[in-house]
Amino acid sequence: MSVTEGRLNPVDQAVISQALLSAAREMGIKLYRSAYSPIVRDGKDASTGILDAEGNAVAQSDELIPMLVGSLSITFRSCAALYPVATLKEGDFYICNHPYHGAHHLQDILIFVPIFHDGTIIGFSAAVAHHLDVGGGAPGLNSTATDFYQEGLVIPPSKYNLAADWNDEGPLRRFIGANIRVPEQTLGDIDSQFAACAVGAARVREMCDKYSATTVRRAMAEMIAYTERRVRAAIAAI
């Protein structure tokens, strides 16, 4: 890899950028094709993306709902403020659906999985999905709710571990399932979110093996900087 003044040459940047976008798209396909509920499987009311180690959005699936990606960085930072990234271990994840901490509404559950490479966090794979039911006073969306506690189960910014808390009927899985009218579909869709995040993490690790973790991080930073330049130019032209 040839790097000039900390930036990759245009060819390397383009190749890695497209690989990151492809990984985000593959995450989206994995999510909706493995989902249980029609709202995700058919309606595709979900989104997936890859964040850098600070929680900045780098790439997103353009086959799902782009608007949902807007909540990723805000919700991520709410989780990281309570559970710093430096404390995360392999298998840990963030989860949240709290509207006051970045989520759109309680039906949108966000999951963030750290991407480790040689013991270092390179970034995060993220998935958000609108769930068919999250409890509350009525199935689905409660149109008679007078406060958001009536809308369903509130998951504040939290950190859990996949093996200890979710897999094999772990305590978090059982707790969420006990508050849901259709646990098979809601839990199945959360499983699909984890599966999508696993795909994203695997693809980023493959890039790190091929190009080096330093190079991938530089490519992520340049994607964000390039987007900022484009947006600033568009605003300046108004």
Residue ranges, per PLM feature:
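Alpha-helix capping and helix-loop boundary segments enriched in small/acidic/polar residues
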Residues: V11, E63-G70, G102-Q107, P139-T146, ...
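Accessory "access/gating" subregions that flank catalytic or transport cores
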Residues: A198-I238
